[in-house]
Amino acid sequence: MENHDSFYKFCQLCQSLYDADDHQEKRDALERHFADFRGSAFMWRELLAPAESDAAADRELTLIFETILSIERTEQENVTRNLKCTIDGAAVPLSRESRITVPQVYEFINDLRGSGSRQERLRLIGQFAAGCTDEDLLTVFRVVSDHAHAGLSAEDVMELVEPWERFQKPVPPALAQPCRRLASVLVKHPEGALAEVKYDGERVQVHKAGSRFKFFSRTLKPVPEHKVAGCREHLTRAFPRARNFILDAEIVMVDGSGEALPFGTLGRLKQMEHADGHVCMYIFDCLRYNGVSYLNATPLDFRRRVLQDEIVPIEGRVVLSAMERTNTLSELRRFVHRTLATGAEGVVLKGRLSSYAPNKRDWFKMKKEHLCDGALVDTLDLVVLGAYYGTGRNCRKMSVFLMGCLDRESNVWTTVTKVHSGLADAALTALSKELRPLMAAPRDDLPEWFDCNESMVPHLLAADPEKMPVWEIACSEMKANIGAHTAGVTMRFPRVKRFRPDKDWSTATDLQEAEQLIRNSQENTKKTFARLATTYDGPSPNKKLKLN
């Protein structure tokens, strides 16, 4: 197995830098070495061009190495092999084969710098030199005398090595806050805003280093391989000039015609249900590209233009997100209404000159629930069918509740969603005491009236659903979708809007009503936003939009 941290490789790199004829050739040699690097990048960078150094200690170490190796600092470029090491008049036997590693040398040099006396440093060098070749010792001398980089600046080394140091270290994502007044976007960003389609998929941060790729989720965890199958090859083709980058993107499952499939179809089992489906990646931001960082200071306009200049779109596989420049409130409003009329999840609004701010909510997001004073929010009146115990201080309390509705055709209760009560501790305790007499731990064989997937069986189940309370559950979006719940309904971001003591099981929403409500909701939403967008005469947000 290849050892990317072999000090022999470090020696070879240093010699190639010395042998290079000009500055660009040195940069090319360094870049080639790190093209598929898998070692300790931080230590390599510190040995080549340390960010900080102890000048006094390094001067003392340089003098010591000049003495024991019998060479001058200025002669390093012309030194070849067959060096001898002599300490206190005694020759130190050197190794014929290099066995040491970069981490060992890094630790050794730090120990040398931390040693107080010359005699202690000589002792450490004598011990370490016994396992070194003459080339190893020459390279260590180059490191302590600040000659390992052979004239490359610290900025050169940082630029060429840092992408691999950053590799596998995800950057906290920039975030968006809910927007209920479009005017507030232009108040914060008077220079104008970039309005972008919000895709109904999963956010992913893409790292490329040479031929290697890593994918991280919104929570900075590795993305399962089945969700990014084929993306490496398509990204390589889409960015043919890229040596390294960090991109922000959204992955969405699309069918053979390029139409987006419902949220949740990125899962392994769901993918199997769509034989012609595949992953499409929508790129919307650039954090780093070919060694240049665009974090914190670079305007979005510029970052977007970098992407436009570099990408070769692959339709249905790797494309830029649909985005449009807006300068007035009417332009912003029309884009939002037109986008929502297509059934998109929402829009994201960003200042044209805004920087990429990790972990900060500097962007705005708008969904249909944020418009029309919440009149377009989907709600269902559902019955509490079960409960799950919480964790931590809520370990003995009902913390999450299973909501469901009656299928009147089969007279069976189906599950719709799980929801947190949103109550404070005292109120949650009172609610638990109220509901506990109406519930019991389910037996292995579930009652005939209850249709529930095994993964959703609650810790406590209603003894009689007709005696359970009704709650109004709101969500950002409601779709017909066969998933974890048996009703075939998906509620995105469900929450308890209010308790409904005025209703009982007979007046709650049943399955047939829920299905009709979903159809009506989707149709009414599209009609509403299509009407609001009738004066909009710009390009369709479903197509790739270019900045002027």
Swiss-Prot record:
Entry keywords, A to Z: ATP-binding, Cell cycle, Cell division, DNA damage, DNA recombination, DNA repair, DNA replication, Ligase, Metal-binding, Nucleotide-binding
**Class of this enzyme:** ligase
Q: Could you tell me which PROSITE patterns the record lists for this protein?
A: DNA_LIGASE_A1 (PS00697), DNA_LIGASE_A3 (PS50160)
A molecular function GO annotation: ATP binding
Binding positions (ATP): 196, 203, 218, 250, 284, 361, 365
Its domain of life reads: Viruses
Binding-site residues, a divalent metal cation 1: 250
Known cofactor(s): a divalent metal cation
Region: Disordered; residue ranges are: 515-548
Q: Which residues bind a divalent metal cation 2?
A: 345
Q: Where is the active site?
A: 198
Q: Which residues form a coiled coil?
A: none
Q: Oxidoreductase: present as a keyword of the record?
A: no
Q: What is its EC number?
A: 6.5.1.1
Reactions this protein catalyses: ATP + (deoxyribonucleotide)n-3'-hydroxyl + 5'-phospho-(deoxyribonucleotide)m = (deoxyribonucleotide)n+m + AMP + diphosphate
Family, similarity comment: Belongs to the ATP-dependent DNA ligase family.
Query: What role is this protein assigned?
Result: Able to ligate a double-stranded synthetic DNA substrate containing a single nick and inefficiently ligated a 1 nucleotide gap but did not ligate a 2 nucleotide gap. It is able to ligate short, complementary overhangs but not blunt-ended double-stranded DNA. May be implicated in DNA repair and recombination.
* Protein name in the entry: DNA ligase
What is the organism of origin for this protein?
A: Lymantria dispar multicapsid nuclear polyhedrosis virus (LdMNPV)
Supply the gene name.
LIG
